[in-house]
């Protein structure tokens, strides 16, 4: 992966307590200051990715607290009536072993939209979006 260095990205913990390391397969990362925009819709694998950027590459998370869905799901099981089901089989853990399940990831830089900004959300451009502006400022702060 070009965003994080080789190493321990996260761990999975099965219901029986067995912990398995999840690793990145290469060491070809690009070392640049980064920010990752997150909000309450950032869930599951997106939280895993955002947390890996933060922990392994020093990225700032910018936005609002994430959904807190740090769980592992089974492969879908199909049934004869056409329905399918997945079940939770474990937890995702950050590379230090803590879980964000139920709590979410707290951003390094708060970028909650005001009520006025929320009502104008679909009118924003890259140049006028206040959350993108906060993310750019976070990256500039990393550069020094």
Q: Where in the sequence are the language-model features?
A:
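Hydrophobic transmembrane alpha-helix bundles
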Residues: 18-28, 48-56, 97-112
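Short, well-structured beta-strand/strand-turn elements
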Residues: 56-70
